[in-house]
Regions:
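Acidic, glycine-anchored loop motifs typical of Ca2+
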Residues: 91-99
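Primarily secretory-pathway and cell-envelope proteins
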Residues: 16-47, 53-55, 100-143
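Hydrophobic beta-strand positions
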Residues: 43, 89-91
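Bacterial Sec-dependent N-terminal signal peptides
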Residues: 1-22
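A short tyrosine-centered beta-strand micro-motif
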Residues: 82-88
């Protein structure tokens, strides 16, 4: 009897673990790249890291850095089920920085998931986040 209970408990725990680690395909599409450069995509899975302003790769759930041309950009990535928010920057002069104009606004194209903007800077996670609980495609329009 104890063996049967142990076996049932083990099966239940393993089935819960499988449900919590479901993976889905996220397709990121960026349709309006105006100038070729290096694309920086940062995917975050929590508000603390997204809202921190810290762009170190260690705190990102996923990141992409690669050359991009003036075409529609699409990338498929596999992520665990959960809530995510995405930041995108096109570095057109390849200096690794967000270049700002006199008013402190970015000179280079940028965007966020849900196509939201913050009032004075990046939007908060709760505005930019989306739930990934099935395969999904999101379109981020750059500004």
């Amino acid at each position: 009897m104890i063996r049967l209970l142990f076996l049932l408990l083990s099966f239940y725990i393993s089935s819960q673990t499988d449900q919590n680690s479901k993976e889905h395909t996220l397709v990121l599409e960026i349709p309006n790249i105006e100038t070729a450069g290096i694309i920086y995509i940062a995917v975050y899975d929590n508000a603390e890291d997204f809202d921190s302003g810290d762009d170190s790769r260690e705190i990102m759930a996923y990141n992409i850095i690669e050359p991009v041309s003036k075409e529609i950009y699409q990338k498929k990535i596999i992520l665990k089920e959960g809530d995510y928010a995405v930041k995108v920057l096109i570095d057109t002069n390849n200096n690794g920085d967000i270049d700002l104009n006199f008013f402190g606004l970015p000179k280079e194209q940028f965007g966020f998931s849900n196509n939201v903007l913050g009032l004075f800077g990046a939007p908060k996670f709760d505005k930019a986040s989306f739930k990934l609980n099935e395969n999904k495609k999101i379109i981020i329009k750059l500004r």
